[in-house]
Amino acid sequence: MFDFFRKKNNGNRDGGEGAPGAPRSGEGATADAGGKTTRDVLAEFTAAPLPDAVDGLLFRVSMADAANPASGFEAYAARLLSDAEAPSLRAIAVEHPVELRRLNTTNLFWSVFDDSTISAGARGTILRIESVLDRLAMISMIMEDDNGAVPASAFTEGQCSEADWRVLRSIANDAGRYLGAADRDNKLDTQYGTTGTRGGNWDLSTRFATACEEMVLPFRLEYRFICDSGTGTIVADVSMPAPDVFPKSRFDEAGGQWVDVSAQRTGAAAAYGLRLAALIASAAFGSSVGVTRVIVNGKEGSIAGATVMSLEFGRIPFTMGTMAAIRDGRFSAPETACDPATLFDMLHLQNSAFNLADDGSLQPVEPLEVELAVVRTPVAEDDRELSPELRDLLHADTVRELDVMSEQDAELGARYRAIMEEKDDSLLLAVAQLEDIVAETTKVTEEDEAVRALRESGVAVKPLYCENVFARYLVSLADSDPAVRYQRVSDIGQAARSSLSRIYRDMGDLDAAEAQARVCIELAPTSAPAYNDLITCFAEGEHYDRIIEVAKEALRIAVTGNDISYIFYRLAFAYWQTGRLREALACYLRVPEASPMGEAGLRERNDLIGEMGNDVPGNDWDPTACLRTAGVPLAPLDDVMEVVGRALVLLCDQNMPLAAAPLASLVASTQRNDILHAVAASLRQGV
């Protein structure tokens, strides 16, 4: 680990700021002996493990001398990385692997790590380093000035410092572009054949998230939002950088030395927060001319941090007042870099909760209260009626009928788990106990008074088990009659049936195992995992032709990545065992290495290729065409995703975000779309 300010040839920086003999870092650029461009310097951070790349740059700069000087760009990079405690990254990366990526959309950096296991301090260090690299990337853009790559020595270290502060105070300069976005096409408004209402919640959500994902910012932006077309309101929670990530020092051109600006970091953070709020407001107002009110809640450090500002913008004051200050340069003037009070007056706010302490730091505040038409009642408790369109599509009359995930009977669940823990002591006893659970839950289902009343009134009601939330939305694929309604059956009852199938299989009674497995499928026609017991039962009897047919049926309704990859894994082996090696290889190629069966799938695929020998297909072979010829459904199928897309857009537009959220997550994962992931997170979590 290297400390840039504690190595040789550091210009006597150990002697303090402006010590005698210290070089005037802002004077004249030195030639870059290595001929590196700023792009070359930045590329090194993704070309090697991040700790090595960071320490490598710090080492190079620390060893620079008159004969081999460091470029101004690299010297400033070393200064920022040292301030960000970058040398401590290696110890963090040992326990928590960190991967650095470069985003094609913004050309900025993104650190990938497991957010669920890392400490707040370690996370903060990683994000400080990420922000340093992002600021360097933005400084590089300033240096290039749209003229292509430039030498890393084109700016002195002092000039890089000034460019850095220019970056920090100019983030709202693109507000005009976002404000005028409502007239542009929204490529995400249509999902699998269903288009959201223009200016409706889905249109607003996808437009706003698109704008946020496009923002080129020096600090990571975390955000959640609610779009409410009914009241013309967008509420956004956004992360705002803490003071400790701002520069500690700044080059004083007049004095020819570096000066300590640590005391100004609180003001810089508050000023940045106000600029970010203005930029977010421009994106919100630019989502539709129907948006007349925007509330931005700033969260210190991360989206989970304390609220340190809550600002309400009105459309006309913003477009006529705030935007005027942004366009004429007052909002990004050098003298406002650390002056939040002046910026605050330029925002022309309708209401605010904003409290600066004597030291200039933002203090926690209560977010402004706002009434919205969007209702965030849990699905299991939501008695609102569905629209006729949704009723026919989802075979339900109220939102709560879509619930398949709430806990049903905790006591019965504990009883089931106890049986399974002790089943190896006596399989026959376990069978009897599980049969009791099946009988009890079946009786409860049959005696449900509400369902009985529906049937007596002439409504067809079918029992339904859903392995996951998506299965409930797909029931129209199982029954085309929109008048049919579904009754949620016991989750524990279904688990007992599945366990019975496995136990019967272990006991060698494959007929009984198959019978239970078929009942599981009958009760869960839209759940791909319900087919797994039958596939395993057939595998036990080596009926691989039958596995192929069952797997094809499962693929017709499979929607999640893990479900799809698991079925292809089982299908691949079945094809292999029936001698259809090319079909087997094509199936194995659809099992991602990162999936639960990825490692096993890769191992079996390699064994298969070894067995194929000279018959391994060449580069002109099309595995997708091979599967189509074999009649294998390439899940997720169009008719499945059309139902998903229709339900998603309608539920979102009709103010039912919690019912829409799982579908948004599914669509985002299927399309691998960060914008849709952001929409899904906001539908799920709100603000």
Predicted regions and their residues:
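Alpha-helical linker/edge segments of TPR/alpha-solenoid repeat scaffolds
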Residues: V461-A483, E542-E549, F573-E583, L608-L634, ...
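TPR repeat positional signature
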Residues: E411, R415, R497, Y531, ...
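Long, charge-dense low-complexity segments
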Residues: F2-V399, I564
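Residue at a conserved register position within TPR or TPR-like alpha-solenoid repeats
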Residues: E422, Y504, F538, Y575, ...
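Short coil turns that delineate tetratricopeptide repeat
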Residues: P525, V559-N562, P596, Q671
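Flexible helix-coil transition and linker loops at the boundaries of alpha-helical arrays
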Residues: R400-M405, E440-G493, C520, L555-I564
